[in-house]
Each structure stands twice: as C-alpha cells, then as structure tokens.
C-alpha cells in the first residue's frame, strides 16, 4: 500500500488510464483505512454565484462578476468549453430582475452544458431545523447544569433571542437565505454538496438525465481556472477539499469540495453541528468540524498531516486566483 500522501498525489492528477490495483488503493488516518473512491468523468461540476448587489450590472450583462480582476463568468464559460462532456452547474441567488434572468437563460442557450440553478428552486427542507428548537435545546442544556456552573448571561441571551425570532421565520435555512455576506454563500454551498447529483436532477434541468440523484459533485470557486480536462478523481472515503498553505501553516478551505455521493456522512456530520449550536458557522463548523468528526481527527493528531490526507489538488486547476486581487465584494 502506498502512503496516503503519495496515493493522493498520484490519483489527483486527472489520469484516466489507471490500473485495477490503483482502484483498490486505500489510505489511512487515525488508525482506520479508507478506500480511494472514484469520481468519474461524468460527475457534474458546480460553481456558485450569490449576488448581493445585482443592481451593479449593466443592461444586457449576465449578473456574474466578469472584470479584469475577477473574470468569474469567463472562468465558468472556460470550464464549460474544456469539460464539454460534463454538466456545469451554477447555483445562483439574489434579487435578480426579469431581464437579468433572461441573460441567464441566454447563457444556457449559448452553452448547452451550463445549467443555472436558482437557490429558491431547490428543495433543501430535508436539511432544515426550527431555530426555536435549536435555542430551546441550548437553553435546556444550560438549565441542566448546577446553578453554580450555569452561564446566566448566555442563558439570558438565548431566551431573548428565542423571543425575537420573527413570525414565519422559524427556520435555520430561512435565516441564511436572508443574509447577504459570506455565510450566505457558505451555508448553501454545504447544502448543495449534500444534494450533489440530486441538485441537478430535482430541478428539472434538461440534459441532466444521465446524472444519478445519488451521484457526486465537484464544487469549484469561480476564481479557480481549469486548464484541461480533470478526468477521474479519487478521494478518501469519497470526499476531499481544497487546502490552503500560508507560511507552512495549512488549513481546510471550502474553495473546492469533491464528493462521490449525495448526503456524504462528513457533510451530514457538519450539518448536525450546525443544528446543535446557536452560533455555528457553515465554514468552520459545517464543513471543517464535520470532516474532522467523520475522520476521527482530534487535537492529538498532526493537523498538517490531516490536511495532506484530505487535500484535493489537481495539476489542471489553478486555485484561488482572487488572492492576488482585492475582494469582489
């Protein structure tokens, strides 16, 4: 058996001519072995553009940022041209006008493998939980402690926020649907990757008949540039994510997420964390802690080694190009 790092490096090169022995490779972490699951050449690629300021676009423009500094629409179109045998989804949200929606339709008509998926058209209800239930569970948890151990300040805040939940808005999903900052992106990205293949089949998009509702998905930030076909990918237990490295300090990132099936248990673990905390964060808790929990990572382990184990990288992807420019927000 190859070491986990070597297996991942050799497998994530987009090579499609792999021997049977490669398909049987396993990698290990925390004393447990995991198969390197394949994600085939037909697995759809998903981009995301949630637009907080749709009014900034001119008439006739597709409302996805496309400037010299942030050529995100061009990157998506480039991916559709290179990966012309894959479906390229774009999950969008925002207060788009009728004319802007017509521009999205024109984009789909020009590039037949691009599918615009409106967040509001996707049924995410199976992942929802009442906000009141989350608050009540945390209130009851505090109340169960001996009086000397309770955080009375926190208890007061929880009770106050419970009372202030707007009528008709008692929903974790709805609370994020109304946000207009990065957690809006991050939360629905997690849900979209839980849906994976079913994100395409349930929304009735033409040309998606070959996608299984149980199949996986490849998410890429719009600042990632595809230079050639990705081929077959491999991921430990069917999941891998982008890893950033700054001054030799590594960190899990959500700029690329690969799953080989819908409802991946690592993402479900993250969703459970999101449903248990009143201050949960979709990036740190919903993705990072969910993956760590799934693979039994603890502070006793080497974090950089865990990042090497779970890292998705590919020689045909230039990642995180927006790091060289100012924020697109």
Swiss-Prot record:
Residues annotated as binding UDP-N-acetyl-alpha-D-glucosamine: 48-50, 72, 219-222, 322, 327-329
Activity regulation description: Protein-arginine N-acetylglucosaminyltransferase activity is inhibited by 100066N compound (flavone analog) and 102644N compound (a substituted isoxazole).
Residues of the signal peptide: none
Molecular functions (GO terms): manganese ion binding; protein-arginine N-acetylglucosaminyltransferase activity; toxin activity
Keyword DNA-binding: no
Main location: secreted
Required cofactor names: Mn(2+)
Record-listed Mn(2+) binding positions: 223, 320, 322
Function: Protein-arginine N-acetylglucosaminyltransferase effector that disrupts TNF signaling in infected cells, including NF-kappa-B signaling, apoptosis and necroptosis. Acts by catalyzing the transfer of a single N-acetylglucosamine (GlcNAc) to a conserved arginine residue in the death domain of host proteins such as FADD: arginine GlcNAcylation prevents homotypic/heterotypic death domain interactions and assembly of the oligomeric TNF-alpha receptor complex, thereby disrupting TNF signaling.
Organism: Escherichia coli O157:H7
The protein, known as: Protein-arginine N-acetylglucosaminyltransferase NleB1
One GO biological process term: symbiont-mediated perturbation of host intracellular transport
Residue intervals passing through the bilayer: none
Residues linked to a glycan: 13, 53, 159, 293
Catalytic reactions of this protein: L-arginyl-[protein] + UDP-N-acetyl-alpha-D-glucosamine = N(omega)-(N-acetyl-beta-D-glucosaminyl)-L-arginyl-[protein] + UDP + H(+)
Motif stretch (DXD motif): 221-223
PTM characteristics: Auto-glycosylated: arginine GlcNAcylation is required for activity toward death domain-containing host target proteins.
Subcellular location: Secreted; Host cytoplasm
Leading EC class: transferase
Similarity remark: Belongs to the glycosyltransferase NleB family.
């Amino acid at each position: 058996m190859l070491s986990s790092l070597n297996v991942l490096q050799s497998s994530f090169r987009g090579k499609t001519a792999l021997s049977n022995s490669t398909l049987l490779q396993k990698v290990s972490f925390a004393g447990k072995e995991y198969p390197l699951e394949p994600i085939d050449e037909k697995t759809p690629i998903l981009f995301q553009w949630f637009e907080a300021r749709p009014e900034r676009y001119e008439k006739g423009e597709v409302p996805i940022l496309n400037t010299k500094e942030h050529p995100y629409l061009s990157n998506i179109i480039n991916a559709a041209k290179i990966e012309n045998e894959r479906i390229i989804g774009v999950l969008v949200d925002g207060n788009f006008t009728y004319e802007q929606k017509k521009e999205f339709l024109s984009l789909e008509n020009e590039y037949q493998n691009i599918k615009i998926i409106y967040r509001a058209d996707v049924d995410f209800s199976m992942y929802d939980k009442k906000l009141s239930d989350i608050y009540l569970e945390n209130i009851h948890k505090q109340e169960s402690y001996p009086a000397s151990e309770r955080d009375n300040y926190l208890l007061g805040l929880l009770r106050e926020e419970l009372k202030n939940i707007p009528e008709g808005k008692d929903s974790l999903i709805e609370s994020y649907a109304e946000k207009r900052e990065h957690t809006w992106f991050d939360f629905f990205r997690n849900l979209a990757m839980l849906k994976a293949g079913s994100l395409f089949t349930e929304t009735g998009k033409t040309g998606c008949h070959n996608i299984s509702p149980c199949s996986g998905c490849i998410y890429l930030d719009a600042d990632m540039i595809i230079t050639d076909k990705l081929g077959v990918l491999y991921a430990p237990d069917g999941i891998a994510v982008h890893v950033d490295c700054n001054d030799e300090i590594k960190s899990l990132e959500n700029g690329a997420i690969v799953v080989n099936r819908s409802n991946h248990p690592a993402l479900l673990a993250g969703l459970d964390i999101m449903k248990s905390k009143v201050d949960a964060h979709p990036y740190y808790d919903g993705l990072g802690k969910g993956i760590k929990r799934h693979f039994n990572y603890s502070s006793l382990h080497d974090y950089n080694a865990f990042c090497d184990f779970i890292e998705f990288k590919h020689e045909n992807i230039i990642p995180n190009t927006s790091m060289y420019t100012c924020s697109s927000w």
